[in-house]
Amino acid sequence: MPTPYLSGSAVALVTPFKSDSSIDFEAIARLTEFHVAAGTNIIIPCGTTGESPTLAEEEQVAIIKTVVEAAQGKLMVAAGAGTNNTHHAVELAKNAEKAGAAAILSVAPYYNKPSQEGFYQHYRHIAEAVAVPIIIYNVPGRTGCNVAASTILRLARDFDNVLAVKEASENFTQISELLEERPSNFAVLTGEDSLILPFMAMGGNGVISVAANEIPAQIRQLVESAGSGDLVTARTLYSRYRKLLKLNFIESNPVPVKYALARMGMIEENYRLPLVPLSAESKRAMDEELTLLGLV
């Protein structure tokens, strides 16, 4: 099977804030350059890890433009552009496309719990509104509902620009169905860093990663080694960074990873409510691991 267009190691980029809660655009540009140097394949601003629920539309557009400019065409920019209101999701997708995003990541409608036909119609409207590739984001743990494999596959077959899914269901039956039945140009990406090794061994195409914020080169190497069958290298990398992957979710994402990046001197440690800083206990655990790994 040929390698799908949207493959490899993608970073779910954090959004750095200043102490007054304004966006730190200089830090965003530096982070983007960091990922270019590390060989990250795809950078995704304005997703869950980017605290998208707290970003105004004009802020999202400005962030995307900043990332596109800093990337200089050296890696793909696939912007988060989803919500549970279909009309608004279409507008966000159009905004991202106009801002220069080469693809969009659109989360499944949450809270209102649509039927599978509702999911299909939601993504149909988005696919018909933009020309850029669309990544469906299926994350039942956050949305409270699952986009079935049959619905994802139906969308992939019906629309030329529905080219990937970020599958964060941890449902290996669903993952297997997607991998076995997908069109040849459709990428199946895991949204769980802890599943990279088994996911790639099953034939997955990559990851949209939180840990790639901290260790982008290592996540890319893990994806590449696992995908090529070099399981010795893949297992060695996974074993070394397994605890960090877990600690990134010791409290709600992206609080732990932003704390880690601040400790690494890459951003200021600021959040927008309702997110708040890590507890002292979680900070101690993260500090210990960052020191052990030589990241601070």
Curated annotation (Swiss-Prot):
Pyruvate binds at T49, I208. Its main location: cytoplasm. Pfam families: DHDPS. SUPFAM superfamilies: Aldolase (SSF51569). The active site is at Y137, K166. Its EC number is 4.3.3.7. Keywords: Amino-acid biosynthesis, Cytoplasm, Diaminopimelate biosynthesis, Lyase, Lysine biosynthesis, Schiff base. The keyword Amino-acid biosynthesis applies. Transmembrane segments: none annotated. It is an enzyme of class 4 (lyase). It is found in: Cytoplasm. One of its GO terms (biological process) is lysine biosynthetic process via diaminopimelate. CDD domains: DHDPS. InterPro entries: Aldolase_TIM, DapA, DapA-like, Schiff_base-form_aldolases_AS. It comes from the Bacteria. Pathway: Amino-acid biosynthesis; L-lysine biosynthesis via DAP pathway; (S)-tetrahydrodipicolinate from L-aspartate: step 3/4. The record marks T48, Y111 as: Part of a proton relay during catalysis. Belongs to the DapA family. Homotetramer; dimer of dimers. Catalyzes the condensation of (S)-aspartate-beta-semialdehyde [(S)-ASA] and pyruvate to 4-hydroxy-tetrahydrodipicolinate (HTPA). This is 4-hydroxy-tetrahydrodipicolinate synthase. It comes from Chlorobium chlorochromatii (strain CaD3).
